[in-house]
Amino acid sequence: MTAILITGYRSFEIGIFDHKDPRVSIIKQAIRKDLIGYLENGVDWFIFTGNLGFEQWALEVANELKEEYPLQIATIFLFETHGDRWNEKNQEVLSQFRAVDFVKYYFPNYEQPTQFSQYYQFLLEKTEGAYVFYDTENETNLKYFLKKAKDMPHYQLLLLTFDRLNDMSQS
């Protein structure tokens, strides 16, 4: 079994507030290309954390690819209450994350800040690599996860960057 964690920018972090934004289709083209590459190289599990934005779009693509490839999808939420306060539209997205092959939460609820690093350490230990939409030009809290991932020997990281997206949009 080979599992890849998929994570990246949340939609508000990159200024995308509408699913019909033309940038979403370019991002999804890149996701499709990269996920097919993973599948053709033996990956059989895609792991999500349940965030809006990049993960949401990657989940949509992964679900489409299930018709062509034998893949499994898991969502491992940080907390059991993840998304409980989201609006109705986002609750629909949350239900898609909960309708995958395997769903768990790591902690029942928030108790202390160290839970975040424990959660990311768990995800790193349970996956062989990560597909991350992230660019050092636009830093977020993902930088802490990436630092841990880069420190792990043999952990495979594939970054989707703004430069790569620009190249795709021009071709």
From Swiss-Prot:
It comes from the Bacteria. Transmembrane segments: none annotated. Gene3D superfamilies: 3.40.50.450. Pfam families: YpsA. Belongs to the UPF0398 family. PANTHER family: UPF0398 PROTEIN SPR0331, UPF0398 PROTEIN YPSA. This is UPF0398 protein MGAS10750_Spy1462. It comes from Streptococcus pyogenes serotype M4 (strain MGAS10750). The lineage of its organism: Bacteria, Bacillati, Bacillota, Bacilli, Lactobacillales.
